Amino acid sequence: MYDFLRTDKVRLPSFSTTQTIVDGINLDETLKGYRTLAVRGRETSSRNIQVHDKNSYINSTNPFLDGAILLGSNIPAKNILVEYQVSTKNYRDQTELYELLNYYINKPLVKLIFTDDLKYFYKGTLANMGEIETSLEHKGEMEFAIHDPYKYSNEIFIEKFAGSGEIKRSMLYPVALEWVEIKAKTNTDKLIIKNDSTGRRIIIDSNITSTDRIKIYFKEFLVEQNGKENISATMDITSDYEDFEINTGDVISTNIDADIELSYRERKL
């Protein structure tokens, strides 16, 4: 005789190997009856390609005009699909579960972490919620639009230089800075922070003394002097503020004698 396994009666583990964390809230642990089944859409990213047909404006049978000319390409936004299971004892519990789930996920932008990749996070917006079955135990899907296709490290890395220095950390992609702080050792009326490897510069037109600290917060577009005075208006209009990035091997310097401290998050696809 054979012992057949009743797959419809197999007890599932209380938590899956991958759990979903939204803005620091672990849904699998917080929502009684909720379980993440699978997460799809993180693995690879294809590129959007812009091409020009070689023969589009020329009526010719020349074989060298076959194909197309690549004009450019970029990595598009991606969608992450979270498949989940809900199992409750009654519909009241199920209603409360979905009320909490909506509260956690239905915001303009949420921070998504999955427990099989705890060192990194995505930023996304709930784009679609699959149709909910009218049963106490059912499966569902929620889709998040990831506008920036990269995932970012939870850890913030800090580099410190005296005068100038090279980015030693090995990174796969260039990254924007979280902030950079300059501790001046001389007086100046113009501070220039430069990535010598790319030529990008940040220019501050302000009277700075040998004891001043200038800190630039890139996401907030904020420039502080000595931790209190907002001098953002002194940033020169020719600064490469939005394009200032660093990568492995880049050399960062200033035009004055100063200590440099900068921070950033690593990013990956």
Residue ranges and their predicted role:
Residues 1-59:
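Polar/acidic, low-complexity leader/linker segments enriched in S/T/G and N/D
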Residues 14, 21-39, 121-127, 201-207, ...:
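Short amphipathic beta-strand/extended segments with alternating polar/hydrophobic composition
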